[in-house]
Design a protein with these regions (language model features):
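Accessory nucleic-acid engagement/destabilization modules that flank
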Residues: 3-228
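Conserved pre-motif I regulatory segment
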Residues: 234-273
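Pre-Walker A (Motif I) flank of P-loop NTPase domains
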Residues: 265-272, 301-302, 352-354
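Walker A/P-loop
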Residues: 265-289
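The Walker A (P-loop) glycine that initiates the GxxxxGKT/S ATP-binding motif of P-loop NTPases
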Residues: 274, 335, 390
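Conserved Walker A/P-loop ATP-binding site and its immediately adjacent core
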Residues: 283, 288, 299-324, 337
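Inter-Walker segment of RecA-like/P-loop motor cores
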Residues: 326-368
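SF2 helicase catalytic motif II
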Residues: 361-363, 374-392
Length: 392
């Protein structure tokens, strides 16, 4: 795959994912610059060698795109805008960390981020910048325009909501920085997923494309769910023997109906406290499906069912597959799922199916692990309905 093609196509994928949360241009900019260092004569010589290959990673290519962006930012009319500089730093870290995250400040107080932004010699950076602009058919004015548009997205999609959160909750400064780190992880996740997905496509791994068009998945799943529940209700009524069994059945039905009706409320964090055997799995699934089905396609990315133990995850997955009527819509992800095929392993790390059943440990890895395969999944949580079973 040609480098220019990779940058453009990975950028298009990032744009489509980023647009779902209002940062399409911002995400595109990260991808268009992430491998800019590969335009260098040094890297091209390295990649084309057949014998005596240097050790993998010996030629740094991940810093150049960030340095190029920072250089153009310093020469732009926006170089004195504090929030714009914050955005450029977020993008720059995303680019420099796309092969592995690192601490910006080490234990000795050294600024490692600044070190990463001063790796490429000026002469080599000028060469890379010239080739990047030529091959990408970009002008400096076009890049400046993209930065300006990305800044607008950053303000609308992140800074304004963050300001609202801080005002409503009287959030301390340290918490504000935590939200900043979440934004950084989101950008890095979009970059890793877009990079890996495009590379997989170029290698012919069609299974790693977006697994399915979700336009009607949730509507179909909800219809199947309702038919499944009607079937269970009919079977149950035929087998009810005692008054106590009838009461339990009616309570379960009422709980499920109330959960379905609750889907009309706005987005938020809600708790469903019920005793064992009350039908939480199917009741919460009904709520999630109705929320997803009534929203526009772009507004609900996935439904997640998070369980504390593998055994519960396995049981819940089987229940959910039967309820939605199509196994291809449901992915089960935990350490007991054995995929010897490398392609299937990649699919597992991507979390692209409409409904994901996984364990709390995999969920926490996605939130906090330093491994790229976990970071990759992070952006899939955006605009999703997340059900946490037996949250501790």
């Amino acid at each position: 795959q040609e480098l220019t093609v990779h940058l453009l196509e990975a950028g298009q994928y990032a744009q489509s994912e980023g647009e779902k949360i209002g940062i399409g241009t911002l995400a595109t900019l990260c991808l268009q610059l992430h491998d800019a260092g590969k335009f260098s004569t040094e890297f091209q010589a390295y990649i084309k060698q057949e014998d005596d290959l240097p050790k993998r990673g010996a030629v740094n290519h991940s810093s150049a795109g960030a340095e190029l962006l920072m250089q153009e930012f310093k020469n732009s009319p926006y170089h004195s805008v504090q929030d714009m500089r914050l955005l450029i730093e977020l993008i720059s870290y995303t680019i420099t960390a796309h092969h592995g995250i690192y601490d910006c400040i080490d234990e000795d107080g050294e600024d490692k981020f600044e070190v990463r932004l001063n790796v490429v010699e000026k002469e080599k950076l000028d060469e890379i910048a010239r080739l990047w602009f030529e091959e990408m058919h970009f002008t400096k004015d076009m890049l400046c325009s993209q930065m300006r548009k990305a800044y607008g997205e950053f303000i609308t999609a992140f800074l304004k909501p963050l300001k609202q959160i801080c005002q409503n909750g009287q959030t301390e400064g340290t918490e504000r920085f935590f939200y900043m780190s979440c934004m950084e992880r989101l950008l890095l996740s979009l970059q890793i997923d877009s990079d890996w997905t495009d590379t997989a496509r170029a290698m012919g791994d069609s299974m790693l494309d977006d697994n399915m068009e979700t336009a009607n998945v949730y509507q179909k799943a909800l219809k199947n769910y309702q038919q499944y529940m009607d079937k269970l209700e009919k079977e149950a009524q035929e087998n009810l023997r005692t008054e106590k069994q009838k009461q339990i059945f009616e309570l379960r039905k009422k709980i499920r109906e109330e959960c379905m009706n609750f889907s009309e409320t706005s987005y938020g964090i809600y708790r469903l406290s019920l005793p064992t055997g009350a039908g939480k799995t199917l009741a919460s699934l009904g709520y999630a499906l109705k929320v997803a089905a009534k929203r526009k396609t772009s507004e609900v990315s996935h439904i997640f069912y998070i369980s504390p133990y593998i055994s519960i995850t396995e049981q819940s997955t089987e229940v959910i597959k039967k309820a939605v009527g199509n196994e291809e819509w449901v992915m089960e992800h935990h350490s007991n799922v054995s995929n010897s095929d490398e392609q299937e392993k990649q699919i597992d790390t991507a979390w692209k199916e409409p409904i994901i059943c996984t364990t709390m440990i995999q969920f926490l890895y996605t939130l906090f692990s330093q491994k790229n395969k976990s970071i990759r999944r992070f952006h899939q949580l955006k605009n999703s309905v997340i059900i946490v079973d037996e949250g501790q």
